[in-house]
Amino acid sequence: AGEIMVDTRNPQWKWIPILRYNTGLVLLQDKGTPTNSLDDEVIYRREWIDQKGHLIAPEFIYSIAQDHNNTIWVGTSKGLFIIPATVDYATSNACERIIIPRNDGTGLGDYLLDNEQVNAIAIDGANRIWIGTATSGIYLMGFTESTLDVDYTLETIAHFTTENSLLPSDDILSIAIQESTG
């Protein structure tokens, strides 16, 4: 298993990425009795359906994080997807892939980090998302207010690579956030 993430909305729920054979996500509820496994509830998912009805079945899940809006961010061998706070994970395998507008006048967009291996995800105090990839460094994403029918949009604040920063490699294995300064 990978890193265990305690759900901030309900600390009895633990999110556990499975990294080996039959990769997926396990959601474990210990019902307040962590030493008694007999009353635990376990939910396992290895496939999700995105907002366009496409099947998402990553070969590997490398990272998981929860932002301050309670959205779950999942980094995989094929990119990333989110599980919005409104999704009941116990009964649904719904997810969303983030679409970044091309801003070229076509009205089209591309999936954020589509087919890019995402090794690390961290959320800072300002609810910015730091995403570490296997080949293209670190992306810093932030929320902006939107005039669309959604409350916010996501934009790239910065993209750090070996060419424009002091990163020793574009293969990012982990990201740590200094809590007091972000």
Annotate each PLM feature.
Residues 13-17, 71-74, 81, 128-132, ...:
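Conserved beta-propeller blade signature
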Residues 20-26, 77-81, 134-139, 181-182:
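Loop/turn residues immediately N-terminal
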Residues 2, 11-25, 79, 87-90:
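Short, conserved, GDST-rich strand-edge loop motifs in beta-rich repeat architectures
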Residues 1-11, 47-68, 101-126, 159-180:
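Short coil-to-beta transitions that initiate beta-strands within beta-rich domains
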Residues 17, 87-117, 155:
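Beta-sheet-dominated scaffold domains
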Residues 18-20, 75, 113-116, 133:
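Generic recognition of stable, solvent-exposed alpha-helical segments in well-folded globular domains
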Residues 28-38, 83-95, 141-152, 163:
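Short loop/turn segments immediately following beta-strands, especially the blade-tip
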